[in-house]
């Protein structure tokens, strides 16, 4: 990997190198490794996550070296730079008609793709459900047995270019029409109720104790989160600004399915 990384880093600093075969071959090799799940834009290292910046750079530089192509699928015509992912059956992936995954995204066995979209560089681990009209953005990292409900938007790193990908850890449940963008990290087995919107600047307020505890960019493991608001002063007066409220936790003493059901009932969370 060191030689690949060196080539990618050099091309990132000097885009003229994108005209050289050595560079384009290296970029395409990185994309192939991502597609196979052998290389990731971010990965767990111990109890932390490491962002592989050079891998993300390769994804960004893959676009300008690709040529536009036109192809047909039945009555539909497409004109794009990116190929689509193939080989779902032998990998044990269920793909419902109108689901789209780009080549360069890794999708593990046991994943179900309802009519949804998975962008290049993304990593979707085994047993995860990507429900109808959900979007998994470029380089986003989705763990095992995650449920991305209908209309969920998981942001990517390309448009605009972001420092870190969104990370959704194992067992998390992301409710309908949630938005998670700008490198937000959702911990294991967390539950986001419907319409929670998390950006890098969104206040996430734990209201389970005697005093509120504020954080940004990270939802702790097993947290149950709902949309909320807080009062902010502006020149024109005081107005409500959206935030997210941690109102409880999933209990680790029960299995995941029971814990999720109990959490939804106990806290009256819409999903």
Identify the role of each PLM range:
Residues 93-233:
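Structural signal for interior beta-strand "rungs" in well-ordered beta-sheet cores
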Residues 1-93, 222, 227-271:
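Terminal amphipathic alpha-helical/low-complexity segments used for targeting or macromolecular assembly
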